[in-house]
Amino acid sequence: MKVLVLSGRFGMGHEMAANAICEQFRKLDKDTEIVKKDLLEELYPHISKLIFGGFRLMVEHCHGIYNFIYKMSGKMKVEMQPRGAAIYKKLKKILEKEQPDVIVCTHPMCVKAIASYKEKTGLSTPLVTCITDISMHPEWKADQTDLYLAPTREIKEHLICEGTKAENILVTGIPVRQQFLNMDRNHLENEKKVRKVLVMGGGLGLMPDLRRLLGKLHSMQSVQTIVITGKNHKMYEEWVNRYEDVKVLGYTENISKYMRWADLVITKA
């Protein structure tokens, strides 16, 4: 069997969910061939970095505008999807090259692109939509989806109310990598009775009120803090040597290690 996993680097959550799916497929069946692609990079190779950069600037500096656009696009049911003859031609090239037995999408842009292609061409390859947001947005819904992987029972009920058959929905939670599945803290006993706080804002390090938060944590006795700034290099440079009891780290793949270490995790929604 061959599985094609499609995602997009709009934030790191969708990408990490795709990585987790690939990891689990390999664990379940070593003979399964897994191919993971960033669909935006495949469709728009010359401007994908510009698009990702613009997205990052918006969520870092204009998150209020981004949230407004996100909510309004849901209410107005505005579809933002790659379409057109040139896009279909590129999708056809990808699918003919890979010849997948199943397609798994962890970003709504990918869902819409593949669903539209299936509708136009009659492609019979099953489409699995893995919803990697904790709230439902209309962009995730596509009639051409054969199976939904829902993060919560509430989202399953929402899909059913929208007309999706219950047997086409599995409540799986958001996929996580193997390292998160065994969060044993027994070997990390806190002998000094220091309270340990982990602060992180996802892969992009989105933490707008960090000055106030770290100032408050620094003022508390017996509190040790680790801040993970992700790929936000500016934030890392600003805080890396600010407080002795606050350790600042950049992007890391080993998040589970620091979650096991912490007594409290403060992060974005």
Can you say where each PLM-predicted feature lies in the sequence?
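Extreme N-terminal starter segment of soluble prokaryotic enzymes
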Residues: 1-4
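Conserved N-terminal ligand/cofactor-binding loop architecture of enzyme catalytic domains
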Residues: 20, 24-92
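Glycosyltransferases and closely related glycan-assembly transferases
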Residues: 89-103, 112-128
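Alpha-helix C-terminal capping/helix-to-coil transition sites in glycosyltransferase folds
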Residues: 99, 143-144, 260-261
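Active-site-proximal region of nucleotide-activated glycan assembly enzymes
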Residues: 120-179
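A short helix/loop element that forms part of the nucleotide-sugar donor recognition site in Leloir-type
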Residues: 181-193
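Donor-nucleotide binding loops and adjacent catalytic segments primarily
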Residues: 191-261
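Acidic donor-binding loop of glycosyltransferase active sites
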Residues: 260-269
